[in-house]
Amino acid sequence: MARIATESRTTGETKIQVTLNLDGSGKAQVDTGVGFLDHMLDQIARHGGMDLEIEACGDQHIDDHHTVEDVGITMGQAFRQAIGDRRGITRFGHAYVPLDEALSRVVVDLSNRPSLSWRVKFPTQKVGNFDTELFKEWFAAFAQQGGITMHVESLYGENSHHIAESCFKALARALRSACAVDATLGGVAPSTKGTLSD
């Protein structure tokens, strides 16, 4: 069964469409109008082994907040649809990813009990024109809508770009592990409850 989903979101602030294939080859076509976010989402596709298409436009004459958050929301909704009832998946995943002097760790549980633990500090308020406080907004929106328990931690780092990119790459690798099908489960949900869809 193909694990592919398309979701869209239209509000007075943004218009977004996301297509996500969990079993892709790492291809990305992303145009959010926010250059650094595009760069980070390309990392999700490339290192997560997913195919990702995103078209977004938002009220960036105000700032990038609505676009960043709503892309996270819509991508999370697409992830939830693509992963389906979560039967037979590995469920848990973690990754440590370095980028030069920075090292980050991400741990995920595809539990359908969304939450975000965020322990990331940036030494600067911006990466280029991108507000670093918006990284947490994207991760929170994606985790909430995707039904993911997520722990994101920057263990150390000095460069804000490197810290952010190592977090996104670590998320990609953690999701890749958690989404993998575990043949030993025989299609059963990896939970003593017998389900992860409720």
From Swiss-Prot:
Pathway in which the depicted protein is active: Amino-acid biosynthesis; L-histidine biosynthesis; L-histidine from 5-phospho-alpha-D-ribose 1-diphosphate: step 6/9
GO molecular function ontology, one term from the record: imidazoleglycerol-phosphate dehydratase activity
Keywords: Amino-acid biosynthesis, Cytoplasm, Histidine biosynthesis, Lyase
Record-level GO BP terms: L-histidine biosynthetic process
Top-level taxon: Bacteria
SUPFAM superfamilies: Ribosomal protein S5 domain 2-like
UniProt xrefs under Pfam families: IGPD
Enzyme class (EC, first level): lyase
Keyword presence, Lipid biosynthesis: no
Key word Transmembrane present: no
Catalysed reaction, written as an equation: D-erythro-1-(imidazol-4-yl)glycerol 3-phosphate = 3-(imidazol-4-yl)-2-oxopropyl phosphate + H2O
Main location: cytoplasm
Cell compartment(s), UniProt: Cytoplasm
UniProt-listed Enzyme Commission number(s): 4.2.1.19
Family to which the UniProt record says this protein belongs: Belongs to the imidazoleglycerol-phosphate dehydratase family.
PANTHER family: IMIDAZOLEGLYCEROL-PHOSPHATE DEHYDRATASE, IMIDAZOLEGLYCEROL-PHOSPHATE DEHYDRATASE HIS7
NCBIfam families linked: PRK00951.1-1, PRK00951.1-5, PRK00951.2-1, PRK00951.2-4
Protein name: Imidazoleglycerol-phosphate dehydratase
Record gene name: hisB
